[in-house]
């Protein structure tokens, strides 16, 4: 397989991945357009595109309510945005392939570990901020000594593993999916005999990858809401 890389630009000594930046911006644009279009001329009795939008929002709302309880309404919009971004980003790489011998110009943003770890760190940041807001700094820090001060190292390790597992799970599934898609595309142009087989396999794999993309977005908000719920409910559980 030919090795290609994403084009980059350096600014203030930092390298920025232009492909990832462009695809992330495209993801946000697609979500904005779809939500804006689906929310126009809304009626009391939903139908058509409004019905789809409300169904997705309710799906997210019902999913996170298991972890957030009466705090659900405070985080519904955040989780809807996270779910939408991860789902669309997961599937962008399945739409087409755009590359030269040197550079790749089209990929799923979530096939890049930098994007995934950034999303995980964002969730972790929100968890800590919400924990401090609910309990105060003293009460929040005291939670790391629960149930006994001896658990401090394990509690700190748990914070790190939560971030790492959230990012690695998403990255591993989406990146591997793009690798298989790339192999099938290469198989398609290998010879006239392998082309039809690769085309058929790619259709099946694309459908399966879209399902995996949905599952990963779904799991992402389940875990994110679980982490936030643990922080905001901690004082109630004690």
UniProtKB/Swiss-Prot annotation:
Transmembrane segments: 18-38, 75-95, 112-132, 179-199, 203-223
Any one GO molecular function term: proton-transporting ATP synthase activity, rotational mechanism
Biological process annotations from GO: proton motive force-driven plasma membrane ATP synthesis
Phosphoprotein among keywords: no
PROSITE patterns: ATPASE_A
Recorded topology in the membrane: Multi-pass membrane protein
Protein's UniProt keywords contain Membrane: yes
Keyword annotations: ATP synthesis, Cell membrane, CF(0), Hydrogen ion transport, Ion transport, Membrane, Transmembrane, Transmembrane helix, Transport
One Pfam family linked to the record: ATP-synt_A
InterPro entries from the UniProt entry: ATP_syn_F0_a_bact/chloroplast, ATP_synth_F0_asu, ATP_synth_F0_asu_AS, F0_ATP_A_sf
Compartments reported by the entry: Cell membrane
Any one GO CC term of the record: plasma membrane
HAMAP family per UniProt: ATP_synth_a_bact
Subunit structure: F-type ATPases have 2 components, CF(1) - the catalytic core - and CF(0) - the membrane proton channel. CF(1) has five subunits: alpha(3), beta(3), gamma(1), delta(1), epsilon(1). CF(0) has three main subunits: a(1), b(2) and c(9-12). The alpha and beta chains form an alternating ring which encloses part of the gamma chain. CF(1) is attached to CF(0) by a central stalk formed by the gamma and epsilon chains, while a peripheral stalk is formed by the delta and b chains.
Function: Key component of the proton channel; it plays a direct role in the translocation of protons across the membrane.
Protein family according to the UniProt entry: Belongs to the ATPase A chain family.
Protein name stated in the entry: ATP synthase subunit a
Organism: Streptococcus agalactiae serotype III (strain NEM316)
Gene that encodes it: atpB
